[in-house]
Amino acid sequence: MQQRIILHIDFDYFYAQCEEIRKPELKTSPIVVCMFSDRGGDSGAVATANYIARKYGVNSGLSIKFAKKRLKERTDSVFLPADFEFYSSISEKSMNIIKEFADVFEYVGRDEAYLDVSKKIEHDFKRASHISQQIKNKIREETKLTCSVGVSGNKLLSKIASNYKKPDGLTVVLPDRISQFIEDLEIRDIHGIGKKTEERLAEEGVKTISNLKDLDVFSLVQMFGRKSGTYIFNAVRGIDDEPVTPRAPTTQIGKIVTLKKDSDDYDFLEEALLQLCDNLNSVIIKENKAFKIVGIPVSYTHLRAHETLRYLVWRRMR
């Protein structure tokens, strides 16, 4: 079986970079793109920030209030409301460029995509490096956007590799360098291993990739269950056979509200939720849409977020 060659393309600090493209004079300033709430003032959270702002500890999910405190010494800091229509327009132009180079194109989100280029470059990693640079150059020329690209024989390694040399990076993981590449990573760098999993492993004295590779699959399944345990066992060995699947951008219709006050009163929250559903129902009926996934995202007092999703066989609101 011939070697697959998969690219993962990730646009660098996407929302903030779009704002730099719109206003180049802001490039030397900390830029913070915010999701402002209906409460006014500094109520809300950071959607993303450029690398200058990140040096001061400003990251996604931080409250705007705390972000401003951390950037207090930077009087040139800029806090901007998210403009998703503008970001989507740049994303669409960039994705259309990427599609030209792919045998199979998989859209992941506004700022990332997978490409299977195996046939186009005849399974040649040297040509994969060249085509990756061509993609980067064309996106920069036509949209002024920079991106980071990971190249490997599977989606998992390419995803990790695209994050390896950010921003504006290009990392190729050759088949005979997989073990060395993974050994140099932190456990948290493995896609799919979150903070809680890392903490659980640390409790067992597993603090490095090498430690983690010493655990057999049965131990990992016992700790995390069959699905997660097996995934971790394979991931730290660079094993992943998931195909690149053609996928177009999905349409999302949602209504978001910030309550006038924090509350744990069930009746009050139910009333607010039903009002949102009524508003959303009107939009769906007006646009004659069908849907298959319903989600309710919730942000708590300290900005910890949680989302519950339900998949439906088929449904249309009437």
Language model features: what each stretch is:
Residues M1-R110, Y114:
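Residues that scaffold, gate, or flank divalent-cation-dependent active/transport sites
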Residues C18-E20, G44-A47, L157-K165, V244-P246:
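Short acidic, glycine/serine/threonine-rich loops at helix termini
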Residues V108-E112, S152-K155, K289-I293:
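Short Gly/Ser/Thr- and Asp/Glu-enriched loop/turn motifs at secondary-structure junctions
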Residues L115-S132:
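Catalytic palm subdomain of template-directed nucleic-acid polymerases
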Residues R127-D184:
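Long, highly charged, low-complexity intrinsically disordered interaction regions
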Residues D189, A202-R304, R310:
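DNA-contacting surface of Y-family translesion DNA polymerases
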Residues H306-R318:
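Positively charged, low-complexity/disordered segments
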